[in-house]
Swiss-Prot record:
The active site is at R170, S219, E289. It is an enzyme of class 1 (oxidoreductase). This is UDP-N-acetylenolpyruvoylglucosamine reductase. The lineage of its organism: Bacteria, Pseudomonadati, Pseudomonadota, Gammaproteobacteria, Chromatiales. Residues 26-190 form the FAD-binding PCMH-type domain. It comes from Alkalilimnicola ehrlichii (strain ATCC BAA-1101 / DSM 17681 / MLHE-1). One of its GO terms (molecular function) is UDP-N-acetylmuramate dehydrogenase activity. GO terms for biological process: cell division; cell wall organization; peptidoglycan biosynthetic process; regulation of cell shape. It is found in: Cytoplasm. Its EC number is 1.3.1.98.
Length: 298
């Protein structure tokens, strides 16, 4: 395999790297610079070398990210595969931001610690889950957070508690110019076999109702208060709606799938069309969960 075709390695910096390789939609323009740190100390050293005005973006599994065809100017920090340390101390789990949520759930179950089972249903990394208070199966990320560790663009690390952040439904705000690099989660003892059985049942139900295995970002829109985005989209008759090779899933209306060769422009146009049509028919303006970044193709 040629070097240009393989995925970036820990400690490696690439220029104009296609982000389609690192997003769950399998679509996206290039990053001017893409860096995957070889651990937290390496990340700190890298950030200290960056120019003061360098734009910074963060990416885990790319499961809630759409990069326009014109790409991203600046540097993208790829945490998955770089910040992936996990350890347990008593009833607390220390996890870095690049740890996939599914891996985190499995690790906690193996350790006999309950409370993290819901992470099995989050298709991203812990860093992304912290940034948006991601949830699944009735659980939310920040309900388990004891403290977090952040880094700023100068490579300064800080420990912070939940009191430093405003946390809501799929929204987190806190100190400006800081990004999550790790967290400590509070859990409690549980029966590993029972937890495994519960997660298996929940994932089986999810697989029956969601287009798992097809390129998507997971849920496209937040649920509005007292309702479900999928219900509103389906009631508007939008299941199966297409724009280019992007399609509203026939299985779950709050998923947009890449049926093969969809461009970021296809996906963004379909998101806008669904949002506008739901607003016209139901008087509800849906708010996207997905982050749309980068420049349109000139």
């Amino acid at each position: 395999m040629m070097a240009a075709e393989r995925r970036i390695q820990p400690g490696e910096l690439r220029h104009w790297e296609p982000m389609a390789r690192y997003t769950s939609w399998r679509a996206g323009g290039p990053a001017e610079r893409l860096y995957r740190p070889a651990g937290l100390a390496d990340l700190v050293a890298f950030l200290r070398r960056l120019p003061e005005d360098e734009p910074l973006f963060w990416c885990g599994l790319g499961s809630n990210l759409l990069v326009r065809e014109g790409g991203l100017r600046g540097t993208v920090i790829l945490t998955q595969g770089g910040l992936d340390a996990l350890r347990v101390e008593g009833e607390q789990v220390h996890a870095e931001a690049g740890v996939a949520c599914g891996r985190l759930s499995r690790y906690c179950i193996r350790q006999g610690l309950a409370g993290a089972e819901f992470f099995a249903g989050i298709p991203g990394t812990l860093g992304g889950a912290l940034a948006m208070n991601a949830g699944a199966f009735g659980g939310e990320t920040w309900s388990r957070v004891r403290r977090v560790e952040t880094v700023d663009r100068h490579g300064v690390l800080r420990r912070r508690g939940p009191e430093d952040f405003r946390v809501g439904y799929r929204h987190v705000s806190g100190p400006a110019g800081e990004w999550f690099v790790a967290a400590v989660l509070d859990l409690e003892p549980g029966d590993a076999q029972a937890m495994q059985a519960r997660v298996k049942a929940l994932l089986s139900q999810r697989n029956r109702t969601q287009p798992i295995g097809e390129p998507s970002c997971g849920s496209v829109f937040r649920n509005p208060p007292g309702d479900h985005a999928a219900r509103l989209i389906e009631a508007a008759g939008l299941k199966g709606l297409r724009r280019g090779a992007a399609q509203v899933s026939e299985r779950h209306a709050n998923f947009i799938i890449n049926t093969g060769g969809a461009t970021p422009a296809d996906i963004e146009a379909l998101i806008e069309q669904v949002r506008d049509e739901v607003a016209r028919r139901h008087g509800v303006t849906l708010v996207p969960e997905v982050h749309i970044v980068g420049e349109a193709q000139s």
